[in-house]
């Protein structure tokens, strides 16, 4: 397969695995034209970074050999158009049944997430809840960090929004996130900046109720 010359070795390996499936060190070495030691070094780094995983495959003759394939994390590096499909479906739903129907879908998603995570908050004080919420949001791709202010309030900052295209069109998604945080934290939550409203990040100020 012809590959762009300006791709890094790591990206070339990822692209090879995407198009060919799991590959052995020998197969990668043959396609890249570099030493096996260099390939193993790249594979080791990529495996530590969670981009690839190895498994042993039996051969017709000889000992089993290790092959390397993409993880779900690596699959996420390749372009996807899920938000376009989702927006198209939501727009069709809105045209057919009205905006309230779309809003109810966001409400149901909020309730589902609340049920999913409420057990994580049991027995925790507010700081621990905020820290756990930041972990949850990070796991979902929001690039979240939290800070404690001198007045005892907390600030939760989300530097990325995986559903930004949807939130830009349907602001009710943002309102549901705010209500979800209030429910999980059992606290007063105020959003002072929002990516969907031309902010650089989403910022939530959290106060004890």
Segments from the language model and where they lie:
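Basic, Lys/Arg-rich alpha-helical nucleic-acid-recognition elements, primarily the DNA-binding modules
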Residues: 1-72
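Residue-level marker of regulatory loop/turn positions in helix-turn-helix DNA-binding domains and
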Residues: 5-6, 78, 82, 173
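Conserved segment of winged-helix/HTH DNA-binding domains
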Residues: 65-99
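Short, well-ordered beta-strand micro-motif
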Residues: 69, 205-207
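Short, charged/polar, Gly/Pro-enriched secondary-structure boundary elements
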Residues: 73-78, 163-165, 209
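Mid-protein regulatory/catalytic core that forms ligand/cofactor-binding pockets
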Residues: 98-205
């Amino acid at each position: 397969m012809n590959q762009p010359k300006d791709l890094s070795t790591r990206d070339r390996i990822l692209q090879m695995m995407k198009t060919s499936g799991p590959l052995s060190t020998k197969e990668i070495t043959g396609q890249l034209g570099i030493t096996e030691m260099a390939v193993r070094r790249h594979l080791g780094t990529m495996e530590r970074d969670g981009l690839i995983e190895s498994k042993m495959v039996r051969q017709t003759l000889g000992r089993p050999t290790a092959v390397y394939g993409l993880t779900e994390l690596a699959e996420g590096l390749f372009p996807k158009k899920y938000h376009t499909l989702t927006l198209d479906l939501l727009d069709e739903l809105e045209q057919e049944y009205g905006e309230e129907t779309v809003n109810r879908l966001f409400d149901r998603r909020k309730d589902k997430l609340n049920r999913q995570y409420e057990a994580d908050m049991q027995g925790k004080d507010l700081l621990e809840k905020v820290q756990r919420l930041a972990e949850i949001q990070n796991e979902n791709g929001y690039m979240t960090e939290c800070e404690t202010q001198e007045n005892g309030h907390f600030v939760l900052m989300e530097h990325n929004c995986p559903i930004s295209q949807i939130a830009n069109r349907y602001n009710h998604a943002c309102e549901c996130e705010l209500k979800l945080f209030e429910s999980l934290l059992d606290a007063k939550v105020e959003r002072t900046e929002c990516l969907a409203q031309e902010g650089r990040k989403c910022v939530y100020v959290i106060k004890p109720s």
